[in-house]
C-alpha cells in the first residue's frame, strides 16, 4: 500500500488531468472512456518523469559524473503506469482523484499492454536494473531495439504452441518519447578501400547500404528519489524511398531496401534456423550496437569535447553477448572517425567496457560464421580480425609461446567468431550472476582466460526490483509486513530481515497463512476470468514458470506428475494432499522438443481434468502467454517454487527470488542462485534434491547411460512408456526417446531424489505452522536479492560510479 504523506505532485496532476482530457479528446473526466483516461494519465506521468530525468542528468553532467550505458537485446519492461505511480508514491492520491470521477484505477491499469521487449530472465533483469539504478541515484541509460512486435503472443491450439504477433505499440507508444533529431545512419555491406597518406594507413568503407536508426526514449522511475533511468529504443527504417526506380516500374527493387531495413526492428529473436534468419539477427545486433555507441560518443562529445576521458566518464555494459559488436564499433569510431592510433583506441576501449556472462553451456555461447560477418559488416569484421591477431600475439608472448593454449583462447577459430571470448578479451571486468556460476566461469568456461587475467573476474549475484513484486503486486503481504516490522522495507530490502524474530509468533504465522489464502483466491479469480479454468485454492500451488528449455527440466516435473497420476489411477481412494501444478512458459519458435514438452503438459492437464475421481486431488494447469503482468498475479499466490535445473546449468535465475520474496518455499537443486537462497533463508526452509555440480561432472566422466535407469526403475519405466502409449490421445515419442537414449540434462539420474523431495515438501505443507515458519523465513531472507543491492555492487566494483 502507498504511504499516506501528501505528495506535492498531486496538485499538478489534479489540475492537468481534466485539462488534458479536454485538449486531447474534448471530454470531461466524467465523459472519458477508460482508454482515454489511461492515455492522459500516462502522458502526465511521462512528463513528470521527463522533467525529473532532465534535472537528474543536468546535475550529473555539471558535477562531471560518470554514467553507465547498459546494452541488452532484451528489456522485459512489462507495464509502466502502475510501477511509475507506485515509485512516485502517487497511488493513493491518484486513486482518490479518479474515485471522485467514479473511475477505477485498477481498471485503467488493464489498458496498458506489456512491453514485451524481452524473452525471459535476461530481459527482466535488465529492466529491474534500470529501476534499481534510478532508485539508488546512479545515472543510467539502457539501449535496445524498439521492436514493433517484441516477443510473440503464445496461443495453444490443441496444446501446440503457436506464435502470434504481439502488437504492443498502439497502447504502449504513449510511454515512448520520439527523438528524431538524434537519428544515426548505420552502414551495412559494401567494400573496404585501403590507402596510405603521410605514412598513415587508412581504411575507408564505401558502397555501403544505409539504415537509419531513430531513438525513442522510455523513462524508468526509481522509488522515492530524484533518479530516473532512460531506456533508449532504436527503430530502423530506410533513409529514403527511391521514387525514380519505383516510377520506372522496378517495384520490387525499390521496396527491397525498405523491407530489409524495416525487418531489423520488426520482432525480437527472429527464427535463425536458416541463413536469412541468421543474417537478420546479426543485422539487429550491429544495428543496436552502432546506434548505441554512436549516440554515447556524440553525447559525451557534447559535454566534454574530447574522447580522451571517455573511459573516465562512461561505462558501457554488455548484458550477455548480443551487444558484443559494440566493442569493434567503438574501435571503428576511434580509428576511422577520430584518427586515434590502434594502441590508444584499444586502451580507451578496454577501460570502457564490462561484460556479464549469463550461460555456462557451450552450445549457448554465441558464435558467428566469419563469412556472414564479413559480408554484413565488412569493416567490423576487419577490426575483429586485427583484434584477434594482436590478442593472440600477446598471449603467445605472455604464455611462453604455448600455441595450444593460444588456440583455445583465440577469438576466431574453426571459421567462427566467438563473441564471449571477444568480450573477455576487450572488457576490464567479466562477471557471473551467482557465486556458483562465477566459479564455474573461472574453473571451466573461461579457465584459460582466468589464469591469464584473474583480476578481471568478479561475481554480482542477480537482484530483482523487489518493490514491483511485493509492494505493488502483493498489497496484503505488504500490509502485514508494515504492521509487523514497519514500512522501511519498502525503501530498503535489508529491513525484511527484521521479520525473522517473528518466526515463532503464532499470531503472525496465522496472519501470514491467511494472506497466502487470500492471494490464492485472488489468483483463482484472475485465472477464471482469463482462461475459464477453476483452481482448487485448498490445494498446494506448485509453480514452475520460466522459459521452456530442456536444461530447466520441466519434463522432470512432468515425470513426477505422471508417477502421481499412475498411483492415483491404481489407488483412487488413497489419501493424497491435493496439489495443483502450475506451468507457464514460452518455447523458442524453432525449438521443436520444447514445444513437445508444452503439448505434453497440456495433454496431462486435459486427461486429468476429464477424470472426476482424480481431478479434485491432482490438477495440472498450463497458463498461456507468460508475461510480466501474469507473473505479478501469480507470485503472491505460489506455495512451492520449482527451481529444478541440472546443477551447473542455470547461471542464477530471478524467478526463484520473486517467489521467495512472496513466501514460496523453494524445491530445487544446488544450482544458480538457489545456493544463495539456501544460505539466506536457512537449510531448514528450503528443500534441496539432486546431484551437485561436481557429482554431475563425475557422472559424465564415468559415462552416463540413462537406458540402464529406465530398465531398472519401475516408476521411471512406466512414466516414459506412458509417453509412448499416449496421453490424452497424443504420443510423445521424441520426448521419451530423448530421456531414454540421451537424457542430456540427467532427468532420470535425479528423478528418485526429486520424487522424495516432493513427498517431503508435501509433509511440510501439511504441518501448517511449520510451513508458515518456512514461508516467513524465506520472506525475511529475500532482501539480499534486491536489484538495489546488485546495481550498487556493479557501480562500486565494476563501473566505478560515484
Residue ranges, per PLM feature:
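A conserved ligand/cofactor-binding region detector
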Residues: 1-802
Amino acid at each position: 500500500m502507498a504511504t499516506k504523506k501528501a505528495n506535492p505532485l498531486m496538485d499538478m496532476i489534479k489540475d492537468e488531468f481534466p485539462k488534458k482530457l479536454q485538449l486531447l479528446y474534448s471530454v470531461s473526466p466524467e465523459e472519458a472512456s477508460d482508454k482515454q483516461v489511461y492515455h492522459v494519465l500516462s502522458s502526465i506521468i511521462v512528463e513528470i518523469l521527463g522533467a525529473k530525468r532532465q534535472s537528474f542528468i543536468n546535475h550529473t553532467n555539471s558535477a562531471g559524473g560518470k554514467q553507465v550505458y547498459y546494452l541488452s537485446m532484451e528489456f522485459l519492461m512489462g507495464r509502466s503506469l502502475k510501477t511509475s505511480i507506485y515509485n512516485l508514491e502517487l497511488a493513493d492520491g491518484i486513486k482518490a482523484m479518479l474515485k471522485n470521477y467514479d473511475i477505477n484505477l485498477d481498471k485503467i491499469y488493464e489498458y496498458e499492454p506489456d512491453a514485451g521487449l524481452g524473452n525471459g530472465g535476461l530481459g527482466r533483469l535488465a529492466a529491474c536494473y534500470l529501476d534499481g539504478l534510478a532508485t539508488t541515484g546512479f545515472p543510467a541509460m539502457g539501449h535496445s531495439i524498439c521492436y514493433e512486435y517484441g516477443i510473440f503472443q503464445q496461443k495453444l491450439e490443441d496444446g501446440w504452441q503457436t506464435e502470434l504477433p504481439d502488437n504492443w505499440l498502439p497502447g504502449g507508444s504513449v510511454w515512448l518519447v520520439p527523438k528524431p533529431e538524434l537519428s544515426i545512419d548505420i552502414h551495412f555491406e559494401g567494400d573496404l578501400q585501403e590507402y596510405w597518406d603521410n605514412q598513415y594507413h587508412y581504411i575507408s568503407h564505401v558502397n555501403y547500404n544505409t539504415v537509419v536508426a531513430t531513438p525513442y526514449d522510455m523513462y524508468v522511475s526509481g522509488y522515492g528519489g530524484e533518479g530516473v533511468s532512460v531506456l533508449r529504443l532504436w527503430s530502423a527504417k530506410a533513409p529514403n524511398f527511391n521514387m525514380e526506380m519505383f516510377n520506372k516500374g522496378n517495384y520490387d527493387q525499390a521496396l527491397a531496401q525498405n523491407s530489409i531495413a524495416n525487418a531489423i526492428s520488426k520482432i525480437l529473436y527472429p527464427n535463425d534456423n536458416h541463413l536469412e534468419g541468421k543474417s537478420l539477427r546479426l543485422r539487429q545486433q550491429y544495428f543496436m550496437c552502432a546506434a548505441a555507441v554512436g549516440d554515447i560518443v556524440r553525447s559525451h562529445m557534447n559535454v566534454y569535447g574530447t574522447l580522451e576521458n571517455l573511459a573516465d566518464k562512461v561505462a558501457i555494459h554488455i548484458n550477455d553477448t548480443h551487444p558484443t559488436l559494440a566493442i569493434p564499433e567503438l574501435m571503428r569510431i576511434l580509428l576511422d572517425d577520430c584518427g586515434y592510433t590502434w594502441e590508444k583506441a584499444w586502451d580507451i576501449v578496454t577501460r570502457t567496457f564490462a561484460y556479464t556472462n549469463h550461460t555456462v553451456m557451450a552450445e549457448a555461447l554465441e558464435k558467428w560464421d566469419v563469412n556472414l560477418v564479413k559480408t554484413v559488416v565488412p569493416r567490423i569484421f576487419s577490426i575483429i580480425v586485427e583484434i584477434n591477431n594482436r590478442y593472440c600475439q600477446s598471449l603467445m608472448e605472455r604464455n611462453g609461446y604455448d600455441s595450444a593454449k593460444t588456440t583455445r583462447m583465440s577469438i576466431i577459430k574453426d571459421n567462427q567468431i566467438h563473441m564471449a571470448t571477444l568480450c573477455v578479451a576487450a572488457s576490464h571486468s567479466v562477471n557471473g550472476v551467482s557465486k556458483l556460476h562465477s566459479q564455474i566461469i573461472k574453473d571451466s568456461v573461461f579457465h584459460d582466460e582466468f589464469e591469464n587475467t584473474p583480476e578481471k573476474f568478479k561475481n554480482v549475484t542477480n537482484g530483482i526490483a523487489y518493490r514491483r513484486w511485493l509492494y505493488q503486486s502483493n498489497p496484503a503481504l505488504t500490509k502485514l509486513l508494515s504492521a509487523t516490522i514497519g514500512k522501511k522495507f519498502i525503501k530498503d530490502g535489508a529491513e525484511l530481515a527484521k521479520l525473522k524474530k517473528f518466526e515463532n509468533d503464532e499470531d503472525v504465522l496465522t496472519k501470514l497463512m491467511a494472506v497466502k489464502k487470500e492471494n490464492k483466491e485472488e489468483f483463482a479469480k484472475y485465472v477464471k476470468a482469463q482462461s475459464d479454468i477453476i483452481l482448487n485454492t485448498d490445494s498446494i500451488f506448485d509453480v514452475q514458470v520460466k522459459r521452456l528449455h530442456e536444461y530447466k527440466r520441466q519434463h522432470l516435473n512432468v515425470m513426477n506428475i505422471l508417477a502421481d497420476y499412475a498411483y492415483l489411477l491404481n489407488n483412487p481412494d488413497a489419501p493424497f494432499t491435493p496439489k495443483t501444478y502450475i506451468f507457464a512458459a514460452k518455447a523458442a519458435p524453432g525449438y521443436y522438443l520444447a514445444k513437445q514438452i508444452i503439448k505434453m503438459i497440456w495433454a496431462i492437464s486435459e486427461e486429468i481434468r476429464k477424470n472426476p475421481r482424480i481431478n479434485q486431488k491432482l490438477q495440472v494447469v498450463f497458463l498461456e502467454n507468460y508475461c510480466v503482468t501474469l507473473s505479478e498475479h501469480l507470485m503472491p499466490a505460489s506455495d512451492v517454487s520449482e527451481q529444478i535445473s541440472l546443477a551447473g546449468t542455470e547461471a542464477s535465475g530471478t524467478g526463484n527470488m520473486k517467489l521467495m520474496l512472496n513466501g514460496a518455499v523453494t524445491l530445487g537443486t544446488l544450482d544458480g542462485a538457489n545456493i544463495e537462497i539456501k544460505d539466506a533463508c536457512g537449510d531448514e526452509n528450503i528443500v534441496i534434491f539432486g546431484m551437485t555440480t561436481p557429482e554431475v561432472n563425475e557422472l559424465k566422466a564415468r559415462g552416463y547411460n540413462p537406458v540402464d535407469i529406465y530398465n531398472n526403475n519401475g516408476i521411471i519405466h512406466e512414466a516414459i512408456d506412458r509417453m509412448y502409449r499416449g496421453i490424452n490421445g497424443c504420443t510423445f515419442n521424441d520426448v521419451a526417446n530423448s530421456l531414454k537414449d540421451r537424457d542430456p540434462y540427467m532427468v532420470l539420474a535425479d528423478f528418485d531424489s526429486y520424487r522424495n523431495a516432493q513427498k517431503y515438501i508435501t509433509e511440510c505443507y501439511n504441518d501448517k505452522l511449520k510451513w508458515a515458519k518456512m514461508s516467513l523465513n524465506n520472506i525475511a531472507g529475500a532482501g539480499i536479492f534486491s536489484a538495489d543491492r546488485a546495481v550498487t555492487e556493479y557501480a562500486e566494483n565494476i563501473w566505478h560510479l560515484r
